[in-house]
From Swiss-Prot:
Subunit: Component of the Mediator complex.
Keyword GTP-binding: no
Originating species: Drosophila melanogaster
Region (Disordered): 224-408, 456-520, 669-743
Name of the featured protein: Mediator of RNA polymerase II transcription subunit 25
Amino acid sequence: MEVDQIPLADVVFVIEGSAINGAYINELKTNYILPTLEHFTTGSIDEREYLIAERFATLYGIVVYRTAANLLEPVCSTYGPFLQPQKVMETIERLPLVGGGMESCAHMAEGFAAAHGCFDDISERRQLLDQTSVQRHCILICNSPPYQMPTTESWKYPGKSCEQLAALFNERKINLSIIAPRKMPVLFKLFMKADGDQPITSKNYAKNIRHLVLLKGYSLKERAPSPNSMAAQMAAPNAAQATVQQQQQQQQNQAGQQQQGQGMPMDTTPAQQQQQQQQQQQQQQQQGNPQQQVMNMNTMQQQQPGPNPPAGLLNPQQQQQLLQQQQQNQFVSNQMQNQNFQQNVGPGQNRWMYPNQPGQARPPFMQGAGNVGGVGQGGGMQQNPNSALISRINAPPPNQTVTSLQQQQQQQAQQQQQQQQQAQQQQQQRMQMLSQQQMLNHQQLQQQQQLAQQQQQQQQGQQQQQVNPNAGNNMMPASNAGNMSNPQQQQQQVGQQSNPQQQGNPQQQQQGNSQQEQASLREKIWTGVLEWSEKPKSDQQKIPHTLQCTVCTNIKDGEPEIKAENWPPKLLMQLMPKHLVGNIGGQFLKDSKMVVFRPTPGEALDSLAKMMTSGYAGCVHFSSIPNSPACDLKVLILLYTPDRNAFLGFIPNNQAMFVERLRKVIQQKQHGNMQQQQQQQQMMQQQGKSPMELQQQQQQQQQQQQMQQDNSQQQHYNQFQLNMQMGGGGPGGGPGPGPGGMPMQQNQMQMNMMQQQRMPLGVGVGVGVGPGGVPNPNLQQQLQQVAPNVAAMQQQQAQQQQQRMVRPMMSNNNPGLRQLLQHQTTPGNQFRPQMGGQNPNQMGAGGPMVGNRNFDDGNYEFM
């Protein structure tokens, strides 16, 4: 899938930052947030390539709102915008979804206001890129209802309630989706407000029956409806019948005991016992209105034909019949409300009224009446009217109502099936029509493309033959192979599209139409050969590859964005590690133009895709052709995206800076490789040497360092003597027969002794220290005697320096001083004492030496 075929979208997640929502965030993230990101990125977020410009990417934002318990923190926090979905997931995982202070509500209105502000900022960025047709989605993830108070912290949307901000989403054409761990009526109301008071669809996207998932503008994987408890009963009918029979027997025993306690006659028939048992069971299961029962009893008495029996016998029977009718009405209403119930329960089954099932309740009534009639006249005269009345009251009404309702439901189901079949037939007809149109359009496009390719190839072949006949002969087989592969592709595509059963759903067809429309917005600007060499792992020769391909670019203002009139017919590409391209700097790839390479299928394409998926990128060089205008481009970076199977070329706008930076990165890489090789060689040499040789090598290095230190100390000592001669002489410039000549010679000798004593102390080896490291006592006594003379000498030098400052012309007569001043820059650094063990070459007249440092450039934004 190509880049421009991805629908652009702006997605803002509004998340409740409380502990009650954080307890379910992992489940919501796995089931809904991650599939949402995969939907907008059209693939797995782990395999996606992120070297893509902002104008071709989906922008994400995150808004976190809190409760009233967070008094010292702002109500809302925003993160983003992000170009990479991985950063969105990392940010959501790091959100502090804790606290909340056991509040039952949260500042949802403030979160909606902040989301509106985020969409305003993103729309400004889209307008700079001339992108107006962008989908906008706001996804709410919460577990608490909103406070009934308007916004106070939003300066752009002040005083707005949560419902007003939800309605504003509909006005601004922003799709609001809601994901919550539990179902709340307030969320349904907000979703309807944001949808323009439209009814909520019956699609189920929830993984758990308790979750609330309301989506608008996009869809996830639909889930099956929640399983009904009736399925378990259908799976084990024998166990259910056994339990029902046991309950009936227990209820019969209880009814017989109650009859004995109330003083009822003991010679009741089994039919009467079952009637009383049914009456008690129905009274326990139903809580109806007594007034309605009395009214229904009166109506039933009016409808009964024949003489009225005694009141003591009719009241329980009529009450039983009325209770059965009420239960049947409730059963019918439950069937109308719950669609899954009717699917799981068959037409001949009854879930709640077990006594009315055929073969259980009614045959004992009729059999009991016949048996009692043959016992005696008294018993028969008393029981036959009752049994006939019971059969006339109980049997007809339930059967008529249930059968009529079942027939109506069957008719409705048949009508729905017919409507579904008609809709499916219409969809199939539309799909066939669309497939035929697509086939015709595709064939026409392919024919046009073939003609254009043939013409361009002929022209290029003629040009190449004029320039280089051998190159033309080498290119002809590749072009012929490309032309031969096109009819095979056409036959495969026509064969795939001609079979309607192999076609996908209408969404795939719509995507195909949109792909064709977007592909028509691109124009082919170049057709030629791409050449590169593959170096195997072993020390073999490089394997050259050539690939026939075309380059397409976007159309802007009716013209192609990039012109390839001066491009050479053959482009040379060099494979390089992808991390080197990242080290160049992301600003070059962001400030670039993009083209799409469409290569011809073959072995060369497979090898190139295999190399690029293993971590390589292509650096395409534009070479100049003699007797033709020069090409403005120098370098093009070619990248491969496996999830879309597309080769994308990025052309930096600043070619000179990009080439210079690329050269520096390659030099640094080569320098680092050379250093690694040298280190490896040294390690190998050291591993081959014996321990005695290693010790001798270390001793030699130490002696060299000590010699360097001694030389530097001798240089400093000579320089110190020159300075002393400059300051201690008379007008003649030296320690001659002037007034101060003899004392200065003595002072010079004393300073020499001081210097000889001090300098070995800093180095660790010298005159003042014996072989065992014990200081010489004679030298210490001499130093104690010289110390007062040194103080007097320093005072005399200060007085003479003041005299020279009063008479500056005197220094011109001293050529040694003039020469020293010319070479001397910063005396403070020259007379700085050397610390023990320090390398004198590290500090010089100009501070620390920086000439030997390697190139280190940290100003670039590394990816």
